[in-house]
Amino acid sequence: MQSEKFDINDLKRRMQGASQALQHELGGLRTGRAAASMLEPVQVDAYGTHMPLNQLATVTVPEPRLLSVQVWDKSMVRAVEKAIVDSNLGLSPATEGQVLRLRIPELNQDRRKELVKVAHKYAEAARVAVRHVRRDGLDTIKKLEKSHEISEDDQKRLDQEVQKATDSAISEIDQLLASKEKEILTV
């Protein structure tokens, strides 16, 4: 019996949101390897407003250590170049017409270790978010059982479903972290 007041799918969606947020945060970590997602946080002063870089240019990865930014509007090349330099990513563009080429410098071992620590912090924050969702779900189930809207057997079954969803979400977070850690530490 599925209670109308308790939706396991909503809990799963909220847990999935935590791992999607982690994926986005990990995407912003520099690994010494070129990735178009590195430039996602870059905001460009264009047409009187701040715009994401991906609304003004196409970012490609022609080589493992090179990003290519093809600016669509010739008048925006300088603004895009300035935004990349000001973004504190440690990248300096070489401009050729409407194309900016960004060499990705090698990361030293200390910087790699720092990035791994940051990745672990992001992953722990995601795990905590998942645990909060689990706690909310278990509290809701307990209230439903106390008010006799569900039976004790249903409570136990729903508790197990919530735990299974939690284990699955934590496992996904651990896989994302392991993958990013390997990517960062690969020289």
UniProtKB/Swiss-Prot annotation:
GO biological process, alphabetically ordered: cytoplasmic translational termination
Regions annotated as coiled coil: none
CC terms in the record's Gene Ontology section: cytosol
Domain of life: Bacteria
Keywords linked to the UniProt accession: Cytoplasm, Protein biosynthesis
Subcellular localization, as worded in the UniProt entry: Cytoplasm
One Gene Ontology term of the molecular function aspect: ribosomal large subunit binding
Pfam families: RRF (PF01765)
CDD domains xref list: RRF (cd00520)
Family from the record: Belongs to the RRF family.
Reported function: Responsible for the release of ribosomes from messenger RNA at the termination of protein biosynthesis. May increase the efficiency of translation by recycling ribosomes from one round of translation to another.
Name recorded for this polypeptide: Ribosome-recycling factor
Species assigned in the record: Rhodopseudomonas palustris (strain HaA2)
